A protein has these predicted regions:
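P-loop/Walker A NTP-binding region and its immediately flanking N-terminal helices
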Residues: 1-158
């Protein structure tokens, strides 16, 4: 993951973003002296009216310091982007990708194939959360939901 300059990347992590966040944080920390980094959450800004002007403006900015030549934008939850936004990003990857690199975090594989073909895709390690169960675990809810609900209703009347 120590590649520099950073290629366009897709960080695919099904139903989570913990490993992607760790990877992004480590890369930013290791390269903040030679890259400008920015993040945007596509879950909050995903329409063509909001997202496209913001990305176009970001690509037109100059780096923060004279010795910095590469700028990297992390698009969190890119699977929420509309088809029009993805089309705009695809065109941007074709035309202006020398100094402005895009990283995508996706939880569902719904990016356009034209974007995926221009990026290095990485499947992030799964985050496993093993719950710590204390006390008795009643599995009746899964094995016989009707009886469980009936038992809960009966206990409310008592």
């Amino acid at each position: 993951m120590a590649a520099f300059p950073p290629p366009h990347r897709i960080l695919f992590e099904p139903l989570n973003d913990r490993s992607s966040h760790v990877e992004w944080t480590m890369y930013v920390a290791a390269n903040k002296h030679r890259c400008d980094f920015e993040e945007i959450d596509a879950a909050a800004m995903n329409s063509i009216d909001d997202f496209a002007p913001w990305v176009t403006q970001w690509m037109s900015f100059v780096p923060s310091q004279a010795h910095i030549r590469i700028r990297v934008l992390m698009v969190w939850h890119a699977h929420f982007l509309t088809a029009a936004c993805q089309q705009m990003l695809r065109r941007s990857l074709e035309q202006r990708s020398f100094r402005c690199r895009l990283w995508f975090h996706i939880e569902e594989p719904t990016l356009q194939p034209a974007i995926v073909s221009r990026c290095i895709a990485t499947r992030m390690p799964d985050y496993r959360n093993v719950p710590d169960v204390r006390g008795e675990l009643n599995t009746l809810l899964w094995t016989d939901p009707h009886a469980c609900e009936k038992g809960m209703a009966n206990s409310e009347h008592v």
